[in-house]
């Protein structure tokens, strides 16, 4: 619910005044209604802050002003201009931080929101099967996946590349409930930390209540993936020395759903260092973040399911004591011959290529059996995609003809 009074916003009048001053410094004059909207707050909530700016001589009214939105309220329709003393004051405020955006949400409100929006959805076998129906997986693997997803427990997915580990983790994210609300930014003892990130958060277009607090964004439960580029530094708030505010660490952006450490063991930081950094958060659902620029630390809520995906044996990455902290370790095996056939047939339908037993057997006899090549779940789709592109280039219909198979496979397999 949108805060009706200044105190309901969780921010003092002086803080709101500074935020307003930064906005009007870059865009002057401004109509009162749109000035308040820049902070994503109702006009009546910021009225005391506007009055404070006028009383101190940092802004002045210029009478009624036409704005982008029509207002029938006299106060909302007033226009304001920043004064010369106001510009000097704004520069002082900007020297502290360059954050110009929606008013941040108090940290306590953020913490309460994260805890309140922990998914309570019970994942049934039927739900899991439906979510993974686009993959060909054994019933045994589905049974193994159910308990950790239900418990939102840390999970190791390991096995050869190309068998769907990342896709499995992504599909599980769809099971963890309805969209959630996250703030654009949070206020931690006067320090601003941006939380909403369009790279990781997908907005949900839905009619929201009239009195909705616009400082919050409705997003799909986030599936946040970090690959080989991940370092321990990215698991701490990043402070921009130029802008002088913080960006939330990547795993905190996954609150409410899944944080995937993809290709675990290939990062610049060692597996042990990464696990050491995350172990408290995994066990206590709290991560202690250091705000280096402010010389302070805060215990932030961490309510994400952590999935480690690796092509390596978990035992080769960390010792037994660490493995004990990640109770669920599930091997994603190569497809069986029957499963590989099913995957191939499904890929044929996707590319509208008529499946023939002769063509399929040619692939196996020519490119698998002589090399004792293991089956991988990604291969049928990759091969047929390549065959489809070759056929298009040659002006031929895509079919499981031996020459088209040869052209596709020779450019796909290193050893062919």
Where do the PLM segments sit?
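Interdomain "pre-motor" coupling segment immediately N-terminal to P-loop NTPase/helicase cores
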Residues: 49-120
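Short alpha-helical segments that sit at the start of domains
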Residues: 1-19
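Dynamic helix-loop-helix/coil hinge segments at AAA+ ATPase domain boundaries and subdomain interfaces
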Residues: 113-142, 370-371
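Conserved ASCE/P-loop NTPase catalytic core
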Residues: 129-307
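C-terminal engagement/docking regions of AAA+ P-loop ATPases
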Residues: 401-416
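Conserved AAA+ ATPase small/helical "lid" subdomain
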Residues: 344-405
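Short acidic, hydrophobic short linear motifs in intrinsically disordered regions
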Residues: 26-38
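A short helix-turn-beta junction within AAA+ P-loop NTPase domains corresponding to the substrate/partner-engaging
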Residues: 277, 318-334
